[in-house]
Each structure stands twice: as C-alpha cells, then as structure tokens.
Design a protein with these regions (language model features):
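Loop-to-transmembrane-helix entry motif
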Residues: 1, 136-139, 143-147, 258, ...
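Gly/Trp-centered helix-boundary motif
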Residues: 1-155, 159, 163-242, 329, ...
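Hydrophobic residues within alpha-helical transmembrane segments
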Residues: 8-12, 137, 149-156, 258, ...
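Hydrophobic/aromatic residues in alpha-helical transmembrane segments
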Residues: 11, 157-161, 270, 283, ...
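Transmembrane alpha-helices
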Residues: 141-155, 280, 306, 325-357
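Short coil/turn motifs that cap or connect alpha-helices
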Residues: 160, 164, 323-324, 336
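Membrane-cytosol interface at the C-terminal ends of specific transmembrane alpha-helices
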Residues: 218-259, 268-330, 342-348
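Glycine-rich helix-loop "coupling/hinge" segments at transmembrane-helix boundaries
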Residues: 263, 274-279, 289-290, 303-305, ...
Length: 374
C-alpha cells in the first residue's frame, strides 16, 4: 500500500506538470470581450487580436504578451485557479508579501485597492513580485523533465558500458594489438575534437533548444565514430607480424576505473564546476547531470551481466553462433534490468535535488526559468 501511495503521488505530479498552464496562468482560459470569443491561455504569447466595433471599425488591438488582462471589462471570463504565471511580476506586491498579509490590486478603473479573493497570492510573492504558488506548479514540469531527461542520458551510458564490462570482462574480447592501440588513439582524438574542441558549438546548440543541442551531440558522436574508424583503417596498413598478434581488451578494467574516478570526485562539486564555465541553460544542466550520474547504473548492470553470462540460456545462444551484440542486447540485457530500474528511480529523485540545489545557488539555470530551487 505504501508503494501505491508513492505511485499515486507520482501520477499526481505528472498531472500537475501536464496541466500547469491551465492551473496557473495570468491569462484567462476563456473570455468574451466586446463580442469576441478569446482563449488567451492557449494562444502564443506573440499573438495579437484586433477587436472591431459592430460597425466594422477597429476598436482595439490586444497584444497577448503585454496586455494586462485583469483590467479589461469582460462580458464573461474564466480564470485559472491561480491567475498568475511564474514569470509575471506583480509590482504592487513585491518584497515577499505574506499570504495572509495585505495585498494590493489595480482594478479596472485603475485604482489601487485591496486584492479580491480570486487575485490574492495564495502562497505570497518573492522579492520581485512573482507568485510562489504558480512557481511551484510550473516548477513541477521543469523538475520532472530534468529528472527524466538527465537519467535517460545516464541510463543510456550506464547500461551500455555496464553491459559491455559485465559480459566481456577482461578476457573475452580479443583484437589485433595494432588495432587495439589505434582504436584508443582514435577514441582520444575523437573525444577531443568531438566534445573538447566543439564545446562552444554544443553550448550554442542547447541555448537554441533541445533539438539543436541533440543535433550537435549527434555531430560530436559522428566525429568520434569517424576518428575511430579512420585510425582502425590506418592500422590495417601496418603489416608487422608482432603487432598483428591478438590481445585481450580489458573493457571491464576501463569501465571500473572510470566509475571509480567519477565516484572519487564529489558529484555536486563537479557539476557546479562545469556549469560555472558553460552557458546557462536548463538543457545543458540536464546533460551535465546525466553524464555524471551513470556510474551507479553501470555498476548494477555490470553485476547482473556477470551473473547472467554464465547461465544456460546465454551459453546456448553463444553455442548457436549468435553474435555478441545479439546475445547481449536481445537475451542477456532484458533479464538484467530489474535492479537497474530501481537505481534509475532513485537517480531521478537525486537529479531533481541536484537541479534544485543549483537553482537555489543561482548556478546553471537561467534567471527567467522558475524551478523548485529558485
């Protein structure tokens, strides 16, 4: 029953995040104004509507992003339960107005009076007049998005590396010595030119949106693959018998040392250091949290693959001549994800706490984005 309570709470947060523009919005959900039917809350902020008189003459132009909707004389209007947006500032209720304190309101006649009940700030305001209740509602969307996106990135990295480390270990994957060393060289140059040299391009991409940011990451990934491929092709041109001897690739050692290296550095301190030198963007924060949170997932995946690789159905797949990729991703990995999902669930909560801490400190997240921490 306790688990069901947590599940219902999660569903509640998802519903709040999905319906945030309907629950908290400073524009009406529905309005009838001078014979026109408007749905301002569901329209783009840059939209403008022209209001005409019964004779067809232009009477008024409503620009949605700057119109003070509370001062208009509507024939009929339906407001959101919280009639404030998280980024809108109430200049008459600045400096941390209390929920039970005196709150001011500018009515339709332009007179400053006591705020009516439906326009009161239920949880008060912050220093610049932003409604705290609206910030909590819309912050739910940001926090859930941060948790899901960042742990999605961490899951892809952790499950992939953990599966390779657990299945192959240090003595199952072999390749020619020259190809092994040239692969490492290609990987080094690929990481340098793919991510180190393109750090500003990556930051600019995420500042323009998640799609542009993901496109830049795909380009960087392509550079890494191209670099490794080129160096592996070069290795074929070197015909030295000694270098053509096969050697084991210690994937488990590489992954385990990488996990230990990341775990030896305080994660919050590492994230603060990285976010302090890159452009402020919520998407960059998600990526940084994701690429620093994969170690726990990789350890669980590695441990499960170490157990599963010795089971009969995996050995049967190998005996039938199935490729290693098919054996890992189609047979072994699906049976190893149960404990990994537990780690991912805790990781989502941890990512939300990290983002809230960064927002509280004013690091990484832009000032115009309201989150639980800010």
């Amino acid at each position: 029953k306790v688990a069901l309570v947590c599940l219902y709470l999660l569903f509640l947060l998802i519903i709040i995040a999905a319906l945030a523009p309907v629950i908290a919005n400073d524009r009406p959900l529905y309005a009838e104004y001078k014979g026109n039917t408007l749905y301002p809350a569901f329209a783009d902020q840059s939209r403008t509507d022209s209001i005409f008189t019964s004779e067809g003459k232009l009477d008024e132009v409503l620009q949605y992003d700057i119109t003070d909707w509370r001062t208009l004389d509507f024939n009929k209007v339906i407001w959101a339960p919280i009639p404030y947006s998280p980024e809108s500032m109430d200049r008459y209720n600045r400096d941390y107005v209390s929920p039970n304190g005196k709150q001011r309101f500018k009515n339709k006649e332009g007179v400053i009076t006591d705020a009516p009940r439906k326009f009161r700030h239920l949880l008060g305001t912050d220093g610049i007049g932003r409604d705290l209740a609206s910030g909590l509602i819309h912050g739910t969307r940001i926090s859930l998005m941060v948790g899901l996106v960042s742990m999605g990135i961490a899951s892809l990295i952790g499950i992939f590396l953990g599966a390779l480390a657990g299945f192959f270990g240090d003595n199952k994957l072999k390749m020619p010595r020259i190809k092994y060393h040239f692969t490492l060289i290609g990987l080094f140059f690929g990481l340098f030119y793919g991510f180190g040299h393109r750090k500003y391009a990556l930051a600019d991409g995420f500042s323009q949106g998640i799609l542009n940011g993901m496109l830049e990451i795909l380009i960087s990934t392509g550079i890494i693959i191209l670099s490794v491929t080129i160096f592996r092709l070069i290795s074929r041109l070197i015909k030295v018998n000694k270098l053509q001897e096969e050697t084991f690739v210690p994937i488990d050692t590489f992954v385990s040392r990488g996990i230990e290296l990341l775990n030896s550095i305080p994660r919050l301190l590492l994230i603060i250091t990285i976010t302090a030198v890159v452009e402020r963007s919520i998407w960059i924060v998600m990526v940084i949290i994701g690429i620093t949170s994969w170690t726990g997932i990789a350890r669980f995946t590695r441990a499960e693959l170490l157990r599963i690789r010795s089971l009969e159905f995996v050995q049967a797949a190998q005996s039938l001549g199935f490729s290693s990729a098919r054996t890992i991703f189609k047979h072994a990995l699906p049976n190893a994800l149960a404990p990994v999902f537990v780690s991912i669930a805790f990781g989502i909560a941890s990512a939300i706490l990290i983002e809230s801490g960064l927002s509280f400190l004013g690091i990484g997240v832009p000032d115009d984005i309201v989150t639980w921490g800010s």
